[in-house]
Amino acid sequence: FIKVSSDHGVDIYRIFDSMNWMENMKLPVEEALKTGKIVEGAICYTGDILNPKELKYTIDYYCKKARQLEKMGCHVIALKDMSSLLKPYAAKKLIEALKEEVRVPIHLHTHDTTGNGIATYLMAAEAGVDIVDCAIGSMSSLTSQPSMNALVEALRGTKRDTGIDPDGLLVLNDYYEHERKIYKPFE
């Protein structure tokens, strides 16, 4: 799959195991590296690193996984918060720790199910995150990604200003607002 998809234009491989079992990620990482494309090793976030009673899913746990992925040769480390569990202050603390542990870029992926998405991204930006995933405003929130429109505005005029034209985003927002209505029954 990796070779064929690479031959047909896939440029970035986000490789993860839902249980963060590094042994299960070795072969796909090795194969993706052979393609010469970007290999992003992802760590699935769960638990609550701010909870003093949390014994397994700690900052040390995530840092160890990140070091293992970097050692495998991953070009980027993704923190994949598929359940919107990562709280804003936890994001700041964890991204700071990951930036200290590895030398490759850190990519944060979250969903906005809890409504914390933008706050989480702002704290991650303060901590130095390199990449985040967003959705255009009219397609964002709920189980989608946080709003790109909101993030661009929140960061405007700061050291993390995206440089993205908000007026251009409004054009896209209006287009997709119409499209979203088609899929409303499936939300």
Predicted segments, located by residue:
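Catalytic cores and adjacent flexible loops of soluble metabolic enzymes
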Residues: 1-187
